[in-house]
Design a protein with these regions (language model features):
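Extracellular loop and loop/strand-boundary signature of outer-membrane beta-barrel proteins
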Residues: 1-4, 19-21, 70-76, 182-185
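Gram-negative (and chloroplast) outer-membrane scaffold detector with strong preference
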Residues: 1-58
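Residues that define the transmembrane beta-barrel architecture of outer-membrane proteins
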Residues: 3-7, 28, 76-84, 191-195
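Residues on the lipid-exposed face of transmembrane beta-strands in outer-membrane beta-barrel proteins
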Residues: 9-15, 34-38, 86-92, 102-106, ...
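Short loop/turn motifs that connect adjacent beta-strands in outer-membrane beta-barrel proteins
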Residues: 17-29, 94-97, 205-213
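Outer-membrane beta-barrel proteins
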Residues: 20-22, 41-46, 99, 110-115, ...
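Flexible glycine-rich, low-complexity coil/linker segments exposed to the extracellular/periplasmic environment
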Residues: 47-48, 55-70, 125-190
Length: 213
């Protein structure tokens, strides 16, 4: 998971005219939007369900799961980046004072580490702690840390064409998930979707003030 926070500057283009005053706005108004945003994020994952690690959520960036910060490896990735939001939505007029809007937006981010995965599997001996080594390569975990379910069948189907039930898929290191293999996709940054429902109150165009006595 990632606890992401976004501060955006967005412009809206309405596909239909919306009237010259709040009282004359149309009943249904589609729109497009786009802009720029500042994104603060903090990827986390659950540790293995074992006495050593206690199956708890931990922040991944300080661990350097791809060797970040060690000699010969990249520096730690930033937890602040940008994103490019764009999308579309619809606004419905409920009555003279209230609107409801539904929109969906796509975000191109400036980071490939919203999920802490972007480069290659590192040499495990350079990682700083046993926790960093455990979180760097999780392919041999028989139990899913997040759900608590057994991973044996799904790993067997992925790694063995015939899915032989007599073979333990965790007995040997899995090919393609070892030092120097791609851990993520280094050719493009991470992207994400965001949807929202908004209820808004329309201020009257003229506010009548009580007479001064």
């Amino acid at each position: 998971r990632n606890d992401a926070k976004e501060l955006s500057l967005v412009g809206i283009f309405k596909l239909r005219g919306d009237g010259r005053s709040p009282n004359r706005r149309i009943a249904f108004s589609p729109y497009l939007f786009g802009g720029v945003a500042l994104l603060a994020h903090n990827p986390k994952a659950k540790t293995p369900d074992s006495p050593e690690f206690d199956n708890k959520w931990v922040a991944l960036q300080p661990l350097g799961t791809e060797g970040q910060g060690q000699p010969g490896y990249a520096k730690p990735y930033s937890l602040v980046t940008y994103s490019i939001p764009f999308g579309a939505g619809f606004t419905w007029k409920i009555n003279a004072e209230w609107n409801i809007s539904i929109e969906g937006g796509f975000r191109f981010s400036g980071s490939d580490y919203l999920d802490d995965v972007g480069g290659l599997f590192p040499d495990p001996t350079v990682l700083k702690t046993p926790l960093a080594r455990a979180m760097s390569n999780r392919t041999l975990e028989p139990i899913s840390a997040r759900t608590g379910q057994d991973r044996t069948d799904i790993v067997r189907r992925i790694t063995q064409p015939n899915a032989d039930p007599s073979v333990d898929p965790f007995a040997d290191p899995l090919g393609g998930w070892q030092q120097g293999d791609y851990r993520g996709s280094p050719t493009r940054n991470d992207q994400y979707l965001l949807s929202s429902i908004t209820v808004s109150y329309i201020l009257p165009s003229k506010i009548k003030c009580p007479p001064i006595r």
